[in-house]
Structures are given as structure tokens and as C-alpha cells.
């Protein structure tokens, strides 16, 4: 398990765009399971939507991507690199995510070759799928 400080040592994201709170399971270069505790204090709830707050779907996808980035960048040979989002396919949003929900984020890599990766992401709340799809990324050496 990784806490927020350990996550921030691996990926460059920071408030208000760091969208994972902890990593529950990690197999470097293969898979990761993360968690986001969704609170009404999230900045995006000010406008999405004030009378009916739901987490924007694109931010659920970003949280999945950040979880995948932790798995990819945990490999010793990838330390110091950045994982850029390269694409998404077949993303589906099944249920809304509300303040008070605990978002479980699981990413498993299907392929990773020469700095390009592809994987499957599934986000759940209380065991029910809220979002799923394929994620692609490219590793980049920071300048």
C-alpha cells in the first residue's frame, strides 16, 4: 500500500489535479489498485453541478490514468519519467459518482513496449462499475 506522500514521489500531479488518495495494491509495470475518497470539498463540485453534484466522468478517467501511471512509473527503469495520456477507447460511464463515495480504481496493463503502454481501467463504487475502458500512455523523459 502507498500513501499520498509515496504517490507524490512517483507521479508529478498535485492539488487540485491529484485524483488518487492511496494505492491499495501494486504490481509495478503490471497493475495497480487505487482509491479516491470523493468529498463535497472537491473544487469541481462548485460548477458540476451545484444543485446536483456528480464527479465529472473525464476526471474519473484521469484518476484511472493516474493509478496506471503509478504502476508504470514504479518500475526502477521508469523512475523520473512522466506518463503522458496517449488515448482512450471504449470508455463507458455506468453510474454517477457522488460526494461521499469511495472510488476504487483498478488498472491492468495488457501491453507495454518501448515506452508505450495499453491497459484496461475499471472504476467501481461499492462493488458496482461506474466507469470502464482502455487507456493508452507514452512514457517521456522529463527535461
Curated annotation (Swiss-Prot):
- Active-site positions, per UniProt? 48
Write out the GO cellular component annotations.
cytoplasm; membrane
- EC number annotated for this UniProt entry: 4.2.1.59
Q: Which residues cross the membrane?
A: none
Spell out the CDD domains in the cross-references. FabZ
Q: Please give the Pfam families that the UniProt record associates with this protein.
A: FabA (PF07977)
Q: Which reaction does it catalyse?
A: a (3R)-hydroxyacyl-[ACP] = a (2E)-enoyl-[ACP] + H2O
- Any Gene Ontology biological process: fatty acid biosynthetic process
One MF term in GO for this entry? (3R)-hydroxyacyl-[acyl-carrier-protein] dehydratase activity
Q: Which UniProt keywords apply?
A: Cytoplasm, Lipid A biosynthesis, Lipid biosynthesis, Lipid metabolism, Lyase
Q: Where in the cell is it found?
A: Cytoplasm
What intrachain disulfides are recorded?
none
The record, for InterPro entries, names:
FabA_FabZ, FabZ, HotDog_dom_sf
Give the enzyme's main class according to its UniProt record, as a single word: lyase
The job of this chain, per UniProt, is described as: Involved in unsaturated fatty acids biosynthesis. Catalyzes the dehydration of short chain beta-hydroxyacyl-ACPs and long chain saturated and unsaturated beta-hydroxyacyl-ACPs.
Return the HAMAP family for the record. FabZ (MF_00406)
Report the PANTHER family cross-referenced here: 3-HYDROXYACYL-[ACYL-CARRIER-PROTEIN] DEHYDRATASE
Family in the record: Belongs to the thioester dehydratase family. FabZ subfamily.
Q: Which NCBIfam families match?
A: fabZ, PRK00006.1
Write the protein's name: 3-hydroxyacyl-[acyl-carrier-protein] dehydratase FabZ
Q: Which organism is it from?
A: Roseiflexus castenholzii (strain DSM 13941 / HLO8)
